[in-house]
Amino acid sequence: MRSEMTLTSTNSAEALAAQDFANTVLSAAAPGFHADCETPAMATPATPTVAQFVIQGSTICLVC
């Protein structure tokens, strides 16, 4: 049951829209760490930004 719910939720229009938004915003990201917070990077500094975009506006159960 849970695997069916996971497959359905990952293919939902909302999930795909969130992924597209995050990919569009961070399309200029470069590998490595940058000291400038305005420069997107595919390292730890970029991770909270992606999480913020994906989590904002949706409900996620961390207990399940």
From Swiss-Prot:
GO BP: any one term: defense response to Gram-positive bacterium
Propeptide positions: 1-42
Modification type L-allo-isoleucine: residues: 55, 60
Modified residues (N,N-dimethylalanine): 43
Record's GO cellular component terms: extraorganismal space
Record's subcellular location: Secreted
Keyword set includes Secreted: yes
Positions of post-translational (E)-2,3-didehydrobutyrine modification: 44, 47, 49, 59
Keywords carried by this UniProt record: Antibiotic, Antimicrobial, D-amino acid, Methylation, Secreted, Thioether bond
Crosslinked positions (S-(2-aminovinyl)-D-cysteine (Cys-Cys)): 61-64
Post-translational modification: Maturation involves the enzymatic conversion of Cys-61 into 2,3-didehydroalanine followed by formation of a thioether bond with Cys-64. The C-terminal meso-lanthionine then undergoes decarboxylation. Dimethylated at the N-terminus. Dimethylation is required for antibiotic activity.
Function: Antibiotic peptide structurally related to lantibiotics. Active against M.luteus (MIC=0.2 ug/ml). Has cytotoxic activity against mouse P388 leukemia cells (IC(50)=1.3 ug/ml).
Family statement: Belongs to the linaridin family.
The name this protein goes by in its record: Cypemycin
Organism: Streptomyces sp
Native organism taxonomy: Bacteria, Bacillati, Actinomycetota, Actinomycetes, Kitasatosporales
